[in-house]
Amino acid sequence: EMLKYVIKYVLDNCPEEINFCDQFVEKGLKKKLTDLVDAKFVRISHHDIVDILLKADQKWEFAPSYDDDIAKEHERYITEYFNGPVFIKDWPKDIKAYYMKVNPDNKTVAAVDLIVPVSGELMGGSQREENLDVLLKRMEEMHVEKDGIEWYLDTRRYGGCVHSGFGMGFERLIMYLTGVDNIRDVIPYPRTPKNCEF
């Protein structure tokens, strides 16, 4: 809903900018954005995504695997396959962060990525592990050092609760909204080598 709201807000309040980008940056941008606002977002597990990729009559640069992340080429194929945005949920626990809640199957975590046509991954999130003992065991399994993150462990030690979080790639959203195809052209604060004096 948030993404749809933001895109609709931009379409309603920045028509000149969208028309400019539609004409000079990405032909069909306005339709792409309108289609996303009207789209039903598919929700599907990582395992089922890999099933689709393995059955595809496609030669992949990076072979799809149930134990790995999906590549940019896979994201592109999946958004075309479903003709719109896709929430990929229940990721393999071994490729995700230690603080993500492990699902009852003990193979996946309660994590989700949102991929959109052309741009790929736009958002990622997960339910966090609220149980200190489970979190410590997971850190040990993944060889995560406790040094420097005692404050984080204290949030579980002194009254943690069930919670989730997500992050959105701001620059990727701006790319999607404007049709600009290089992330360096949309970053608000340029990051150039040897240009940040301390």
Protein language model regions, located:
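C-terminal substrate/ligand-recognition segments
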Residues: L114-G124
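Active-site pocket scaffolds in enzymes
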Residues: S126-Q127, N131-F198
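Conserved aromatic-histidine-acidic binding/catalytic patches
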Residues: V37, M123, Q127
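Metal-assisted phosphate- and nucleotidyl-transfer catalytic regions
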Residues: E1-V116, E141-C161
